[in-house]
């Protein structure tokens, strides 16, 4: 894990198994609010702003390894043991990086 982990801003909706949805490049958690509200009857939906996006901190470091480490830190801070994970575009690549590093944390 990198030593420059960012504490990510996130939005939370609903109750149920945890589902994290990651936005794409130049997006933010705002992009997924409508869908999160629809899914909130079945899931607890977490919408983080990835580093350098939305309300999360900014850094010169912007790579998938670092972004997946940021997500790992968020999941641990929230005390989530396992998550469902979805991502669009850049968020999809972050999700793949996370899945390769921590497959045991995914349903």
Positions of predicted regions on the chain:
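Conserved hydrolase catalytic core segment
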Residues: 81-107
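Conserved HGGG/HGGXW glycine-rich cap/lid loop of the alpha/beta-hydrolase fold
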Residues: 9-58
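Active-site loop/oxyanion-hole signature of alpha/beta-hydrolase fold enzymes
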Residues: 36-37, 46-86
């Amino acid at each position: 894990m990198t030593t420059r982990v960012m504490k990510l801003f996130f939005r939370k909706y609903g109750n149920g198994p945890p589902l994290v949805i990651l936005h794409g490049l130049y997006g933010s958690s705002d992009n997924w609010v409508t869908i999160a509200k629809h899914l909130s009857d079945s899931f607890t939906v977490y919408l983080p702003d990835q580093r350098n996006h939305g309300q999360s901190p900014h850094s010169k470091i912007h790579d998938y390894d670092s972004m997946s480490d940021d997500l790992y830190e968020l999941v641990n801070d929230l005390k989530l043991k396992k998550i469902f994970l979805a991502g669009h575009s850049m968020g999809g690549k972050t999700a793949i990086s996370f899945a390769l590093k921590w497959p045991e944390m995914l349903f």
